[in-house]
Amino acid sequence: MSDVTHANGAVANEADDALVIGDHSFSSRILVGTSRYPNPQVMLDALEATGTELVTVAIRRVNIENPAPESHLDLLRRGGYEVLPNTAGCYTAREAVLTARLAREALGTDLLKLEVIGDDETLMPDVEQLLDAAKTLVDDGFTVLAYANDDPITCRKLADLGCAAVMPLGSPIGSGMGIVNPYNLRIIREMIEDTPLIVDAGIGTASDAVTAMELGYDGILVNTAIAQAQHPVDMGRAMRKAVEAGRSAHRAGRIPRRLYAEASSSMEGRIGT
């Protein structure tokens, strides 16, 4: 990739623009879910198209202790992907902590995507249980990536607890509604400067990914938008390009919005003057 030169002379080297989460570093800023694909081969092809290095797996849906040949985990490992176990399906802090510890023991990773859901219809986080689980798991040495509401106060509390990344939702899980509250996401970004922020849930197409990155977010997590697309591999490729474009645009610095027009050409030298 090329360097980006800012107006003040600063140069942003895109090749060195790694996503750092705790002690882990990734060149790709896309995290991808591994469910709902038409078949395993489509999943693998789509993952490759995104350029992702970190893929998330729901622990309750896989046999982590005795993964059979050609199992979900086996395919991902042989593909060279780092697995990010998640606690999807947990409704209490106790369930999430137990699931996380089982995953660490079986998979040998400190990485964890923490989800503590409040109900089956909205799949929104239960904030009280989420904060309780986050504190316990951070104290227990996990590198916690916490799925959260798009609430600035909750997100700040998660960052203050020591979560390695905070993942506010763009809209409800699987809805494809995109970024429905960019104002809250912008406030969260301004309030939390030193902790990676990743938009998780609701992304429906590539333009949503661009929006997330232009808001200054460090990455996105996407699953349904790719897995359920008419052509998952093409959508995976589109997401990769969208994240790169949005990241570059954010780093380049957009022009301020103006209420009135401003001519781009000088008015000097007009004919008849």
From Swiss-Prot:
It catalyses: [ThiS sulfur-carrier protein]-C-terminal-Gly-aminoethanethioate + 2-iminoacetate + 1-deoxy-D-xylulose 5-phosphate = [ThiS sulfur-carrier protein]-C-terminal Gly-Gly + 2-[(2R,5Z)-2-carboxy-4-methylthiazol-5(2H)-ylidene]ethyl phosphate + 2 H2O + H(+). The active site is at residue 113. Its EC number is 2.8.1.10. It is found in: Cytoplasm. Disulfide bonds: none annotated. One of its GO terms (molecular function) is thiazole synthase activity. 1-deoxy-D-xylulose 5-phosphate binds at residues 174, 201-202, 223-224. GO terms for cellular component: cytoplasm. GO terms for biological process: thiamine diphosphate biosynthetic process. InterPro entries: Aldolase_TIM (IPR013785), Thiazole_synthase_ThiG (IPR033983), ThiG (IPR008867). Keywords: Cytoplasm, Schiff base, Thiamine biosynthesis, Transferase. It holds the Pfam family ThiG. Pathway: Cofactor biosynthesis; thiamine diphosphate biosynthesis. It comes from the Bacteria. Its main location: cytoplasm. Homotetramer. Forms heterodimers with either ThiH or ThiS. Catalyzes the rearrangement of 1-deoxy-D-xylulose 5-phosphate (DXP) to produce the thiazole phosphate moiety of thiamine. Sulfur is provided by the thiocarboxylate moiety of the carrier protein ThiS. In vitro, sulfur can be provided by H(2)S. Belongs to the ThiG family. This is Thiazole synthase. It comes from Salinibacter ruber (strain DSM 13855 / M31). The gene is thiG.
